[in-house]
Amino acid sequence: MFFRAYAKINISLDVVGKREDDYHLLEMIMQRIELYDILEVTKNKTGINIKCNKSYVPLDERNLVYKAAKLFLDTYNLKGGVDFNIIKNIPVSAGLAGGSSDAATTLLAMRELYNIDVSDDELCKLGLKIGADVPYCIKGGTALCEGIGEKVTNLKGFKGHILVLVKPKFGVSTKEVYKSLDINKIYRHPNTEGLIKAVENNDLRYVSENMRNVLENVTLKKHTIIKEIKEKMIRSGALGSMMSGSGPSVFGFFDDMLKAQRCYEYFKSKYNDVYITRTI
């Protein structure tokens, strides 16, 4: 059986507090995009086996697919195992939830493969044990995510909007970005309520002009190239441009495919991981 594991972008990312265990409390609007990994999943009699088309992806218990499969088998006391063949298209350490989406898709695939009667909400609780973005990746679409990311409220779809996505030639550690964030020095928060209304009204211009990610300045201090990519996107005709998640991926929304294509071609001459895609 084949399953798609979709990437996400952030339309907004705000940090509104911090728990005693040092996890940050978030308020984010997440959006699924048409960039995906493919998971080929097959039952076997014993063990979890992983293959992948990218050599840098670990094939053992460090892989979130492995963790998700093991968690599912253990939780429901299932005998047997599963083989995975991962076709990796989403860049790693990019702020696009590639690993979390693979884990979420693994849980959904295991439910189908083993015919277990378990709701999406129950899968989300399992997924949270793997990572804070996994519950959103199970539900997908357009959503407001709160808490550490586990409270997912689906919004009316913000579908079909063109974006150009660029991942620079380095990765970023989410943990390190949050560690470097001083929540007392966040002077400009996103207007999450206004963005929710704009998303639900399908108002691309308002969304593009008012997107905000409070982690951007943290990552920018170490990687000024992010600012340069954003500025070039705007000059290329993007309605707005922002870093996704903890970075370093940057995206820009376009209302003109020709402008988007030209922007794509410019960045493709400089970077490997460049995409024209859409919100879904």
Swiss-Prot record:
Pathway(s) served: Isoprenoid biosynthesis; isopentenyl diphosphate biosynthesis via DXP pathway; isopentenyl diphosphate from 1-deoxy-D-xylulose 5-phosphate: step 3/6
Coiled-coil portions: none
Stored InterPro entries: GHMP_kinase_C_dom, GHMP_kinase_C_sf, GHMP_kinase_N_dom, IspE, Ribosomal_Su5_D2-typ_SF, Ribsml_uS5_D2-typ_fold_subgr
Binding-site list for ATP: P91, V92, S93, A94, G95, L96, A97, G98, G99, S100, S101
UniProt keyword annotations, A-Z: ATP-binding, Isoprene biosynthesis, Kinase, Nucleotide-binding, Transferase
UniProt-listed Enzyme Commission number(s): 2.7.1.148
GO molecular function: 4-(cytidine 5'-diphospho)-2-C-methyl-D-erythritol kinase activity; ATP binding
Key word Transmembrane helix present: no
Catalytic activity: 4-CDP-2-C-methyl-D-erythritol + ATP = 4-CDP-2-C-methyl-D-erythritol 2-phosphate + ADP + H(+)
Family: Belongs to the GHMP kinase family. IspE subfamily.
Name of this chain's protein: 4-diphosphocytidyl-2-C-methyl-D-erythritol kinase
Organism in which the protein naturally occurs: Clostridium novyi (strain NT)
